[in-house]
């Protein structure tokens, strides 16, 4: 499965969607995560 995280806020956020860390997303930025089938 593929998930796309988009920052719709007018400011920078830190998206934490994976173990061990996350990613800085500027306003309007996106982050695509590919997850293996069967991942819980």
UniProtKB/Swiss-Prot annotation:
Protein's GO biological process: defense response to fungus; killing of cells of another organism
Source domain of life: Eukaryota
InterPro entries reported in the protein's UniProt record: Osmotin/thaumatin-like_sf, Thaumatin
UniProt entry tagged with the keyword Coiled coil: no
Assigned keywords, A-Z: Antimicrobial, Disulfide bond, Fungicide, Pathogenesis-related protein, Plant defense
Keyword Disulfide bond included in the entry's annotation: yes
Further comment: On the 2D-gel the determined pI of isoform 1 is: 8.9, its MW is: 22 kDa. On the 2D-gel the determined pI of isoform 2 is: 9.1, its MW is: 22 kDa.
Similarity section: Belongs to the thaumatin family.
Reported function: Has antifungal activity. Inhibits spore germination and mycelia growth in F.solani (IC(50)=67.0 ug/ml), C.gloeosporioides (IC(50)=32.1 ug/ml) and a Neurospora isolate (IC(50)=57.5 ug/ml).
Entry protein name: Osmotin
